[in-house]
UniProtKB/Swiss-Prot annotation:
Protein's name in the database: Pentatricopeptide repeat-containing protein At3g09650, chloroplastic
Pfam families xref list: PPR, PPR_1, PPR_2, PPR_3
Gene (name only): HCF152
Keywords for the protein's UniProt record, in alphabetical order: Chloroplast, Nucleotide-binding, Plastid, Repeat, RNA-binding, Transit peptide
Family: Belongs to the PPR family. P subfamily.
Gene Ontology BP annotations: mRNA processing
Disulfide bonds: none
Gene3D superfamilies (alphabetical): Tetratricopeptide repeat domain (1.25.40.10)
PANTHER family in alphabetical order: BNAC05G43320D PROTEIN, PENTACOTRIPEPTIDE-REPEAT REGION OF PRORP DOMAIN-CONTAINING PROTEIN
Record organism: Arabidopsis thaliana
Bias kind Acidic residues: ranges: 355-372
UniProt PPR repeat ranges: 235-269, 270-304, 305-339, 413-443, 451-485, 486-521, 522-556, 557-587, 593-627, 628-658
């Protein structure tokens, strides 16, 4: 019996073929035309310079005969009704997309390429979730029948864009990659949507975004005649998307290389490019350079927009510098144009404060390099960052000139105020958050009035402070003010109830959200309430909500699976956690990460099933994942639970090798297997291992672990180890009836025990005195 009930579907698979989208933004700015772009083959014909590039048009015409279409598809035995195709095409040309879909569903034959491509295009172009699902179902059918070649590049590109804008990043990327593998280049707007969606996603999304951008631009460069691929060449928007990925990673070198590459494609940086640069400065901790990005925009004559102001305030709030953020908002309220001057003054004040702090700490500046955390490598890295910003912002090298003025006055809007309010919320300033809301209500400018994001921020502030009644009052006030609460607002409230272990009230809110507000819960809503069930040890409830989510057609995310695994692991049901893990592995929409592996290891280790846990770790390594501190911590606890100190020695050996990775220099090593990353153990891991070794009388290994703790700045719990030694080993090596052979064998162990007693401060042979509990003999 499968504990994870699949959602109701005609498919026999445990998972729906594609996730149901939550929402779609307004129609994308992509011209819907009947004649699609040409598909350019990018397969190996480029090796022969004299050979013409193969091109074929996937566009059909309304007058195409059945024989022509059959010949084009390469399947002369296939028959379909030309009359039905004409009716379908008539509906599509008149923008009767829903009627065309009904006609397609009722038809028993597969329409021709023109009808299919146009139907997918128009469904993708609509801003309705069900339309995207319909378009995806057509693609699924064609894939199953091996007829994907019936769709043209325009329809696939629109489908990828719609999927990206609805949050289905992996689906959008898979469509783009499928086009590339088939030898076709997607339209720049289509692949830019995928790159942008990846750059903003979590995990390794930004890295994959950069890889996708490079892969496409390399293929475009292969064409000698660039006019053939003019619609696939990257534009400024494409570069902004990949630069955003670099900013999210804090990778200044890649940012600079791609920024320089813009000129090769005749692309000029725009205001969004520099807004992304503000984010880059924030990610790498270069707060003092933000003002020079703004000055660079003004000096280059680029039109400053309100999004730049948003980026500035968000950057300073992210640094926790609410003082500067408040000054920006105040300058905007006073209709000042000398914002650059204000920011330079803030930089000068920060520099002065930093110099004063350094003067106070001057006596600590000459401590040992290791103690202070200083390394030459860190200095080189910092210097590299400085050099990149000197190229990106040459105006920052000599900022002695007069700061430029803004081209016009910008008044703060609700987003500016809300961003500042989020800073108050993160700092626990609940009263300031509430006062800001009241001040926004009194603004004359309607653009400054609070919106649903503002109210949600206030709700978050009260929830974080544990004031759930006040948070519900804000929700009621939103209804009175005519500001509809959104899904995020309800999710914040759900999280608050779950944190306070009020799962019943969370369930009531979930029903209220659906029935009264008409807002369907999403995967985040269910993840929150599943996690709440874990907090009250209700694994059955967690499973029930997981199955309810799938029944509603909501695709589980990585967090959904790992949260359910946590429920079973915490309740002592590792086999059920393993079954959830297997479902996760088989779900193509989810990428298994180290957290999921660790949760599986934790489930077995909690019961002392160390052999099962070790098998999971072996599988993990085979799949390219290296154990981290959490993995080793679970294993150490499992060894302690199973009372197998011998396994602790093997575990310590592996950890010791991982800790020494950075110290080993092997620049010319030609090994095919990459070395595992360096491990920095924490107090919990080392303390558990030391505890096991002391109890098992492995004093030499215990001293090694203690030395490792001291190297990593972790104070050993000497009192605890002394108590263990006195209780368990105080009479060790005191037998007078041991044979000489036995005495000889334990010489090394006795020496280690004496060294350990010396470290504990107990009487030992190093003092030349006997350890006796009785009165001292003079």
């Amino acid at each position: 019996m499968n504990i994870l009930r699949p959602p109701t579907s005609s498919s026999s698979s445990s998972f729906p073929p594609y996730p149901k989208p939550v929402s779609l933004t307004p129609p994308v700015s992509f011209t819907l035309i009947h004649n699609p772009i040409n598909l350019c083959s990018i397969n190996p014909p480029f090796t022969n310079a004299g050979r013409p590039i193969f091109q074929r048009s996937a566009s059909g015409t309304a007058n195409s005969s059945a024989e022509d279409l059959s010949s084009f598809l390469g399947s002369p035995s296939e028959a379909y009704s030309t009359h039905n195709d004409q009716e379908l095409l008539f509906l599509l040309r008149n923008r009767k997309t829903d009627e065309a879909w009904a006609k397609y569903v009722q038809s028993t034959h597969l329409p021709g390429p023109t009808c299919l491509s146009r139907l997918v295009s128009q469904l993708s172009y609509q801003s309705k979730p069900e339309s995207l699902t319909r378009a995806q179902s057509i693609l699924t059918r064609l894939r199953n029948e091996r007829q994907l070649h019936r769709l043209d590049a325009n329809s696939l590109g629109l489908l990828a864009m719609a999927a990206a804008k609805s949050g289905q990043t992996l689906y959008a990327v898979s469509v783009i990659k499928s086009m590339i593998r088939s030898g076709y280049l997607p339209h720049v707007k289509a692949w830019t949507a995928a790159v942008a969606s990846l750059s903003a996603s979590g995990d390794d999304g930004p890295e994959e975004s950069i890889k996708l951008f490079i892969a496409i631009t390399r293929r475009v460069k292969r064409f000698g005649d660039q006019s053939l691929v003019g619609q696939s060449r990257p534009d400024t928007a494409a570069f902004n998307a990949v630069l955003n990925a670099c900013a999210n990673l804090g990778d200044t070198d890649k940012y600079w290389k791609l920024f320089e590459e813009m000129s090769e494609w005749d692309c000029e940086p725009d205001v969004l490019t520099y807004n992304v640069m503000i984010k880059l400065c924030a990610r790498v901790g270069r707060k003092e350079l933000i003002v020079f990005v703004l000055e660079r925009i003004i000096d280059k004559g680029i039109k400053v927009c309100m999004t730049t102001m948003h980026s500035l305030v968000a950057a300073y709030v992210g640094f926790g510098d609410l003082r500067t953020a408040e000054r920006i908002v105040q300058a905007m309220r006073e209709k000042r144009r000398d914002l650059c001057k204000v920011l330079r003054e803030c930089n000068a004040e920060d520099l002065k404060e930093k110099e004063e702090e350094e003067a106070e700490d001057d006596e600590d500046a000459f401590e040992d390099d290791e103690d202070s955390g200083y390394s030459a490598r860190d200095e080189v890295s910092e210097e590299g960052v400085v050099d990149v910003f000197k190229k990106l912002l040459p105006n920052s090298v000599d900022p002695s000139g007069e700061p430029p003025l803004l081209p016009k006055v910008f008044a703060p809007d609700s987003r500016i105020y809300t961003t500042l309010m989020k800073g108050y919320m993160k700092n626990g300033r609940v009263a300031d958050t509430a006062r800001m809301l009241e001040a926004m209500r009194r603004q004359d400018d309607r653009n400054s009035h609070p919106d649903e994001v503002t109210y949600t921020t206030v709700v978050s502030a009260f929830v974080n402070a544990g004031l759930m009644d006040r948070a519900r009052q804000v929700l009621a006030e939103m209804a009175r003010m005519g500001v509809p609460a959104n899904r995020i607002t309800y999710n914040v409230l759900l999280k608050g109830y779950c944190k306070q272990l009020q799962i019943d009230r969370a369930e009531d809110l979930l029903r209220e959200m659906t029935e009264d507000a008409g807002i369907e819960p999403d995967v985040v809503s269910y993840n929150i309430i599943i996690d709440g069930c874990i907090l009250i040890d209700d694994s059955a409830g967690a499973l029930a909500f997981f199955n309810e989510m799938r029944t509603r057609g909501i695709a589980p995310t990585k967090i959904s699976y790992t949260t359910l695994m946590k429920a079973f692991a915490m309740s002592g049901q590792p086999k059920l956690a393993n079954r959830v893990f297997d479902e996760m592995m088989n779900d193509p929409r989810v990428k298994v990460d180290l957290i999921a592996w660790n949760m599986l290891v934790e489930g077995y280790c909690r019961l002392g099933l160390i052999e099962d846990a070790q098998r999971v770790v072996s599988r993990m390594k085979e799949n390219g994942f290296y154990p981290n501190v959490a993995t080793y911590g679970s294993l150490a606890n499992g060894v302690s639970q199973a009372r197998k100190p011998g396994d602790a020695l093997l575990l310590w050996k592996e950890i010791k090798e991982r800790c020494a990775v950075k110290k080993k220099e092997a620049p010319s090593d030609s090994s095919s297997d990459p070395a595992p990353p360096m491990l920095k153990p924490d107090e919990g891991l080392l303390d558990t291992l030391a505890d096991i070794c002391v109890r098992a009388a492995f004093f030499k290994k215990a001293l090694e672990i203690i030395a490792c703790m001291e190297e990593n700045g972790i104070p050993p719990n000497k009192t605890k180890y002394k108590k263990i030694y006195v209780e368990m080993h105080s009479r060790m090596f005191t037998s007078k009836h041991a044979s000489q052979a036995r005495i000889d064998r334990r010489v090394e162990r006795k020496r280690a025990a004496e060294a350990f007693k010396f470290w504990l401060g107990l009487p030992n042979s190093y003092y030349g005195s006997e350890w006796k509990l009785g009165p001292r003999e003079d």
